[in-house]
Design a protein with these regions (language model features):
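Bacterial N-terminal signal peptides
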Residues: 7-19
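Signal peptide processing junction and immediate N-terminal pro/mature segment
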Residues: 17-28
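Asp-box/BNR beta-propeller blade signature and adjacent active/binding-site loops
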Residues: 28-388
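Positively charged n-region of N-terminal signal peptides that target proteins for export
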Residues: 1-4
């Protein structure tokens, strides 16, 4: 009876979406065969095929990366702020926490250096992961906790503020952070919702260099499942000053929402024409002014099908592609109204491997370093080689 009830809810929600999906947004494919020959082309030392206009980079850390000053870059690991002066070959560690036994930073995190030089880190604390007990009968884990925190440094990462708890609800992932033109910092997080269990997205805004934070409205489109709802968003500021955020969904496309008050509230929620598997993308403004998007498409290039997962109201209500065998890139000159043709820049060559959860770092103007939270692939490319 419960499953029938949820099935009706899912059907009604999908009916509400009819008309939102443009007819030309269906995942495009003219063949049903893999169009990338991994037996030829470039291979990385970790076994991935990469586009011939990209190169492998020798860097062990996953990111996210920031530029501290010329020839100095930084990132974090589970408990340290890390600084490199040799393009990531070696790292000097500075402890983030006075008591590291209480904190463990998850791989999905966000780090930024503001225009005033403040370092801000947002993360979910795995040390406080608790009470996860998903029920296949009620389709929920109502007491689950995985808190969101933020902290800052005023001395280039040598010392850090006490982590500030922003919410205790289960945080599926923290994926992105930006500074707006007027100096406000906004990062995206997640918050689990219940009855039934599913995920939602929230953002936090700071107008004082990370000292205090204001939470946005909760972006909740419903869902039923421990991987359902809207999740793992990436955001950027548009030329008109508004913010745009792309949301991972299980509905075949990124959805988007916009804010005209620096992420304090979000509205105009709708589907985009960008087909996407159930995986997060990374959406960034480059020094050139272009936008770039790195993500996993719904199908492998050249194919019309892919094994689906979910549809059981425990993983998700709708069956969905979890395609993570390829990573693609595209660019926009007009704030995402139009995009260049997607190009596959990386592909797995071994079973049970993936390329997913990208971090994007513009190492120098037009030079993009791409790393992944859940893949050993590390690669670099030049913007000029992929735009006309």
């Amino acid at each position: 009876m419960i499953k029938q009830f949820y099935a009706i809810l899912f059907f009604l929600s999908m009916q509400a979406c009819i008309g939102i999906f443009p007819l030309d947004t269906q995942a495009q494919s003219n063949t049903n065969r893999d169009t990338i020959n991994v037996r030829s082309g470039n291979k990385t030392s970790t076994g991935f095929w990469i586009h011939d206009k990209t190169r492998e980079i020798n860097i062990s850390r996953i990111g996210p990366f920031i530029q501290m000053k010329k020839d100095v870059m930084a990132t974090v690991d589970t408990s340290n702020f890390l600084v490199s002066t040799d393009e990531g070959l070696t790292w000097k560690a500075f402890p983030l926490f006075k008591d590291s036994s209480k904190f463990f930073i998850r791989p999905e995190r966000a780090l930024i250096k503001t225009k005033k030089g403040t370092l801000i880190l947002a993360f979910a604390n795995d040390k406080e992961r608790a009470k996860w007990n998903w029920s296949k009968d009620t389709h929920d884990s109502p007491e689950a906790e995985l808190p969101t925190y933020a902290m800052y440094s005023k001395d280039s990462g040598k010392s850090w503020s006490q982590p500030q708890l922003l919410h205790k609800e289960w945080t599926g992932a923290i994926r992105d952070i930006i500074e707006t033109k007027d100096g406000q910092v906004v990062f995206s997080s997640m918050m689990m919702r219940h009855n039934p269990g599913h995920h939602a997205v929230v953002t936090y805004n700071s107008a004082d260099e990370g000292k205090t934070w204001t939470r946005s409205n909760i972006i909740d489109l419903g869902g039923v499942g421990d991987h359902d709802g809207v999740t793992e968003s990436t955001l950027e500021q548009m030329k008109d000053g508004s913010l745009k955020m792309l949301l991972r969904t299980n509905w075949g496309y990124f959805w988007q929402t916009s804010s005209t008050n620096n992420g304090l509230s979000w509205k105009n929620l709708k589907s985009t024409p960008i087909d996407a598997s159930s995986s997060p993308g990374m959406f960034k403004r480059l020094k050139s002014g272009r936008l770039v998007l790195v993500w996993n498409r719904y199908y492998p290039q050249g194919k019309k099908s892919y094994p689906l997962r979910g549809g059981d109201y425990n993983f998700s209500a709708a069956p969905v592609s979890m395609h993570r065998e390829e990573i693609s890139i595209m660019f926009s000159d007009d704030d995402g109204k139009n995009w260049s043709q997607p190009v596959v820049i990386g592909k797995t060559t071994e079973p049970k491997t993936q390329i997913a959860y990208p971090y994007l770092f513009e190492k120098s103007p037009g030079e993009l370093w791409i790393s992944f939270a859940f893949s050993k692939l590390r690669m670099a490319l030049y913007e000029k080689d992929f735009v006309q």
